[in-house]
Amino acid sequence: MLFINKSYFDIHNFNTKKGYTMIYTVTTTTPLAQVKEELVAHSKESGFGVLGSYEFQKILQTKGFPIDKDITVYEVCNPSAAQEILQSMSAISVYLPCRLSVYEENGKTVLATINMKTVADSLDIDEELKSHIYSVYEYLENIMNSWN
């Protein structure tokens, strides 16, 4: 059984040892249900399509491992960006499609994703590919900040 020390994450805010934020989060007062309802439209406005979603509360309930939190992860993709990145570096596929997590914490809605700038900075890649990854990540940030 896996045990996670929640206070570790509260204190460290998902930072790496070098101080880079690995998980980018945005908090909004917009209700969770509204964010989930509008996420597809906001993604399309930024050139991303939603490929699928995973409602962990429902999935884990059916497996006999219920959780109290409503956590949904959306897989989003910009096909032309994915093509360019994958043609440059196949291994980056482990981070694709991009994922946006939506859940409620302390009465507010939280949107979270992997900080692709941190990922790009940690890879030995050329500046053109790094710049392209940064650009895609900025679109994800814009989607996540749509409710603020």
Residue ranges of model-derived segments:
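Compact, glycine-rich, soluble single-domain proteins
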Residues: E55-C98
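Terminal, regulation- and interaction-focused segments at domain boundaries
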Residues: K18-S46
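Short, Lys/Arg-enriched N-terminal segments with co-localized hydrophobic residues
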Residues: L2-T21
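Beta-strand/loop substructures that line and gate deep hydrophobic ligand-binding cavities in soluble
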Residues: R99-D126
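Well-ordered alpha/beta subsegment
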Residues: S122-N148
